């Protein structure tokens, strides 16, 4: 097996490879819900994603034997860095996310590269995975691999959690939970009142989607 190389990327063509890798590596997972490709590209593109206006971002691709075998994004959200540490981020906190890797060796090399970049930028703490901001897909899936993700939550192979644990340096910072609701059952009285209130509000309109106006 050839040498593993990790390269910083930034051109439109390289960003497309970065995005496409997730589709390739998760194609066999029936519970992975592919994002719209256009939206995935915009997420990675300065000028399209407002996140770049207040963040430093560096994307990396891992290559071996002429093939792309992994990816990671290292980033510093300056709005989050300015927050009170009690809210979870704060001064000196950087992030990495959007990890994809063929195996543990590649994953660890990518994470090490992301950590090195964050150190060079003066960061002293990593809160990860974070893909990209806390308002996108934060956290690492540790339960629920047998069903698709809920809204705004990521879905990763079970082995990724093992890769992170194997590093030995990462400890859980917060538990994120999602909940299921049986929509065939009648809504509780409180929810019914909220819905009825909205229906009576003349400023609220519910319309069917007209794709011709997209």
Model-inferred region functions:
Residues 45-61:
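A short helix-loop-beta-strand connector motif used in the catalytic cores of GNAT acetyltransferases and
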Residues 82-169:
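Acyl-donor binding region in acyl/amide transferases
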Residues 61, 67-77:
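Conserved beta-strand in the GNAT
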Residues 60-62, 99, 179:
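Short beta-strand element of the conserved SAM-dependent methyltransferase core
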Residues 1-47, 202-214:
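Short amphipathic alpha-helix that is part of the acyltransferase structural core
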Residues 57, 93, 174-178:
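Extracellular structured ligand-interaction cores
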Residues 2-4, 154-214:
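Acyltransferase donor/substrate-recognition loop-hinge adjacent to the catalytic core
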Residues 43, 141-144, 188-189:
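Short low-complexity, flexible loop/linker segments enriched in glycine and/or proline
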């Amino acid at each position: 097996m050839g040498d593993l190389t990790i390269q910083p990327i930034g051109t439109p063509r390289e960003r497309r490879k970065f995005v496409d890798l997730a589709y390739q590596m998760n194609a066999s997972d029936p519970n992975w819900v592919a994002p719209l490709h256009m939206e995935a590209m915009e997420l990675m593109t300065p000028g399209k994603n407002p996140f770049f206006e207040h963040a430093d971002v560096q994307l990396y691709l891992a290559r071996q034997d002429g093939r792309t075998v992994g990816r990671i994004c290292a980033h510093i959200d300056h709005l989050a860095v300015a927050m009170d540490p009690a809210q979870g981020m704060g001064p000196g906190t950087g992030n990495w996310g959007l990890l994809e890797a063929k195996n543990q060796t590649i994953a660890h090399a990518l994470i090490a590269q992301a950590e090195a970049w964050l150190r060079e930028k003066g960061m002293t703490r990593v809160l990860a995975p974070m893909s990209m901001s806390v308002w996108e897909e934060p956290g690492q899936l540790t339960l629920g691999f047998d069903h698709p993700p809920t809204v705004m939550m990521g879905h990763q192979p079970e082995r990724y959690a093992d890769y992170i644990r194997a590093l030995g340096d990462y400890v859980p910072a917060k538990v994120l939970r999602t909940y299921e609701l049986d929509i065939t059952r009648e809504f509780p009285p409180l929810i019914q009142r909220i819905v009825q209130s909205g229906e009576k509000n003349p400023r609220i309109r519910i319309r069917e989607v007209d794709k011709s106006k997209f």
